[in-house]
Amino acid sequence: MAGSSAATSCARFLALLATCLLWNEAASFTASGWNKAFATFYGGSDASGTMGGACGYGDLYSTGYGTNTAALSTVLFNDGASCGQCYRIMCDYQADRRFCISGTSVTITATNLCPPNYALPNDAGGWCNPPRQHFDMAEPAWLKIGVYVGGIVPVMYQRVPCAKQGGVRFTINGRDYFELVLVSNVGGVGSIQSVSIKGSRTGWMAMSRNWGVNWQSNAYLDGQSLSFKVTSSDGQTLTFLDVAPAGWTFGQTFSTSQQFS
């Protein structure tokens, strides 16, 4: 009996330990290993040419992303699934001592696509062609790691957790029977796997990715308070209840106090 009881207690402990380990793995995104790529820059000295972009964040100043941003090559962009991810980038000084700034790094957020240019070779202008891993960085961010006249430099990069101030934000655009919701200021892993929406008179409804970080619903939700359920690309799910009051209008942005880790 004593042996059986001890075995049962041990099994329960191991099950609890496994649960805790799995929870910790899902609960906090950690930095990846280092990889090699190349980086160029665009958008001008004030990064005004980086506004908008294929992720749909719009004005990067007002949405909190600033000038530490980059457009990702086709492979890294992953049809928009990488929007919002954060990368620490440093120039590979050992590979290019002439144009690399040694001992510095910059953390950027993915906000745009660097489109392929199949008219040019991959190593002579077609920098963002598959299968290249490439960052076309906002000029102010690039100048923290590279010398302007270099134009293109070899880099080392790693995925890192996104550190954000405040909670996740929801901007509601569209029209009747077409809600287009921009989900921004996402911390932790930074990118989103799925979004669901719920009106005060409906159940939960899955949204579809329209483009970038804009998620679409075709329900009629006017006059209802809105709640959202967001799952990040590393499997964390947060529920944001009554984010928008019943009197919301298209074009409004609503901030929350909840954030991914």
UniProtKB/Swiss-Prot annotation:
Localization in the cell: Secreted, Cell wall; Membrane
Domain Expansin-like CBD: 177-256
InterPro entries, A to Z: Expan_Lol_pI (IPR007118), Expansin (IPR002963), Expansin/allergen_DPBB_dom (IPR007112), Expansin_CBD (IPR007117), Expansin_CBD_sf (IPR036749), RlpA-like_DPBB (IPR009009), RlpA-like_sf (IPR036908)
Bilayer topology term: Peripheral membrane protein
BP term (GO), one: plant-type cell wall loosening
Key word Cell wall biogenesis/degradation present: yes
Record key words, sorted: Cell wall, Cell wall biogenesis/degradation, Disulfide bond, Membrane, Secreted, Signal
SMART domains named in the record: DPBB_1 (SM00837)
SS bond partners: 55-83, 86-162, 91-100
Induction: By gibberellin (GA3) and wounding.
Tissue: Expressed in adventitious root primordia, coleoptiles, shoot apex, leaf primordia, panicles and flowers.
Stored PROSITE patterns: EXPANSIN_CBD (PS50843), EXPANSIN_EG45 (PS50842)
N-terminal signal peptide: 1-28
Residues covered by the Expansin-like EG45 domain: 52-167
Family note: Belongs to the expansin family. Expansin A subfamily.
Function as written in the Swiss-Prot or TrEMBL entry: May cause loosening and extension of plant cell walls by disrupting non-covalent bonding between cellulose microfibrils and matrix glucans. No enzymatic activity has been found. May be required for rapid internodal elongation in deepwater rice during submergence.
The protein, known as: Expansin-A1
Organism: Oryza sativa subsp. japonica
Encoding gene, per UniProt annotation: EXPA1
